[in-house]
Amino acid sequence: MPNTDVSSLSMLGQQTETAQSPEQAVLEKVPSNHAGTDYVVRFTAPEFTSLCPMTGQPDFAHIVIDYIPGEWLVESKSLKLFLHSFRNHGAFHEDCSIYIAKRIVELLDPKWLRIGAYWYPRGGIPIDVFWQTGKPPEGVWLPEQGVATYRGRG
């Protein structure tokens, strides 16, 4: 029988406030009922927002997170609120992208994780950030992230 114990979760099914910073945001996990099976979980945040640490202007990204769970899954509402906590947070693109991935890795200890952060241009230059924990296990179906390279008017 699947493990559906959610008693340790503090946000799911509750009214919650958005944390004012990523450091304050709570990420929660739930047990995986298929820990012995290698499969990919994908989260896509096509409207991720943070602030430029120098100008305070908004920065926007399309973020794709793929991971192969071990014993745990990230609870999706907590992930949504964690990502939303960057809205008023000033940090460079690279820092936001890697921080997100490392927080998830710290929480879950997944078998594998990758992040693709496709940032929209500021100052005329798009910045894309890619990171993964290592090679994915053999035989896992790993779709492309499907985000087109920024072309502007080209």
UniProtKB/Swiss-Prot annotation:
Q: Quick one: which pathway?
A: tRNA modification; tRNA-queuosine biosynthesis
Iron among keywords? no
Question: What Gene Ontology biological process does one annotation of this record name?
Answer: queuosine biosynthetic process
Against Gene3D superfamilies, the record matches this protein to: 3.30.1130.10
- Annotated positions binding substrate: 74-76, 93-94
Record function comment: Catalyzes the NADPH-dependent reduction of 7-cyano-7-deazaguanine (preQ0) to 7-aminomethyl-7-deazaguanine (preQ1).
Provide the family line: Belongs to the GTP cyclohydrolase I family. QueF type 1 subfamily.
Q: What is this protein called?
A: NADPH-dependent 7-cyano-7-deazaguanine reductase
Organism, scientific name: Rhizobium leguminosarum bv. trifolii (strain WSM2304)
**Gene name per UniProt:** queF
